[in-house]
Amino acid sequence: TRSYGVTGVQTCALPILERQWVAFAANGSVLPRKSGVSELPMTGSVPFTAPDSMTETVELPHRGKVTGMAVPEGITLIVGGGYHGKSTFLEALQNGVYNHIGGDGRELVITDNTAVKLRAEDGRSVRNVDISMFINDLPNGRDTTCFSTMDASGSTSQAAGVVESMEAGTRLLLIDEDTSATNFMVRDALMQRVISREKEPITPFIERMRALYEQAGISTILVAGSSGAFFYEADRVIQMDRYHVVDITEKVRNICGQNACGQHVMEQVQTAAFEMPVFDRKSPAAGHKREVTDTGRERGGRRGRHGSGAADRPRTMKVKIMGKEMLMLDKENVDLRYTEQLADSEQTMALAYFMRYLLEKAKSAQTVRESVSEIETLFEKKGWQAFCSGYVPCGLARPRTQEIYAVLNRYRG
């Protein structure tokens, strides 16, 4: 078995957390990959270089002093023309929660290890999630403080994803506008005049991102390419220009009419305040009814001779994975295609064993947080043996806390 070295990442990330940064990328890092199906670095690519205004030096164990770009807490916008490296940079950041093999090129791209890559997931299930900070006053009168659906729209799935990430303890959201639901992210001024706020149940993410940081301590790094509205909310704006990083924060402030303190001169939409969700929802694994195996034999056994026979016992669930994107628990599929920070199928197999344990042994009144806490506490005490019946198979890698939440949230059973 192998683990993805959360402790190692935490050791490297310690100076980052102490300085209130959410990410760090060392000069000389190679961010592009050889191809879309390869983890090898692209040969001949432009090495990463930090802009002077964001250059910092940290001292790391076994590395000494390392210079690169520090991304501070708050709201950071990544912009630039198509094919200039915006999504490549974000992908490097989303994988910066893990240690990298030497020669990967991204060994010193380090991200807050609670970071969650967020995207729209049309068709996913949502169970008992309080999405009222984003969606309210539905035409059918449905309660959005405890919302469930087996077929979420893009905007609903992304709203649920934010709240589930908060429940999982994230300190950083990573979002690419290209893979997001447009109506969840932003509503321009003209649309707001045509369709009044009273007729629109969705409060877009742009109107909550500041409060998420100031009230919940959750920063955002957002790749944007089509809407300039995000400029008004950003603390820092970086431009990818032919794979080079340029800090254009002051330029954007001047264009948007902000003063030197970052205060908006232009009038902004006033959004109603919201209450932080209470994370006490019941775990989908709680109260799961297990199938029972009849241990008595039809003929020749004690039961066949009218004896009492052995007691019936619960049947162990079968687990199976299909690559890193799907796992099966008996006949129930859990779709993890859009859980983008899963590194490989070994983590998916570990998630399958964790889910089987919860479905077979979870307490009926257990909350989602209690379920995840039980898994992690048991793993620390007993390791893989606690989750594997009989023997521990090869090919297991420990997933992060955030991915354990993700598989629980996507279980439909």
For the regions a language model picked out, list residue spans one by one.
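Single conserved hydrophobic/aromatic residue that forms the stacking wall/gate
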Residues: T1-C12
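N-terminal pre-Walker A segment at the start of P-loop NTPase domains
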Residues: K34-T67
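Glycine-rich phosphate-binding P-loop
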Residues: T67-N95
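AAA+/P-loop NTPase substrate/partner-engagement loops
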Residues: G96-I135
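Conserved alpha-helical scaffold flanking the Walker A/P-loop in AAA+ ATPase domains
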Residues: S153-S165
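Conserved P-loop NTPase nucleotide-binding/switch module
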Residues: S165-M209, Y213-E214, V223-R253
